[in-house]
Amino acid sequence: GYAPSIASPANGKFVADFEAANKAAPDLYGADSYGVLFFYKAAVEKAGSTDTDKVRTAMRGLQWNTPQGTKTMRAGDHQAMQDMYAMRVNGGKFEVVGQVKADAAIGADVCSRF
């Protein structure tokens, strides 16, 4: 989930920039789209190339910062992991009322195919 009130290093800047550009608060889709751009950027930097195979390899196990906090792309099953948030809606605004750490929010990586 996502809420503009999530306390992460990247979120404050993201919210301010998004609101200035769009005259509206960001939602999950805006936050995820923003975060995935930095995933690709981090993978290209790690690969030292934009070559598809090199970037794909660099994505395995990669960590990057997003408005929702740090995300990790698991190497085995390519599952993106992040902390998950429980929300309450008050007056049309999302309020974070709980948080589950990424490693507790998803099952173990048992994939050995990749």
Model-derived segments and spans:
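Extracytosolic ligand-binding ectodomains
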Residues: 1-114
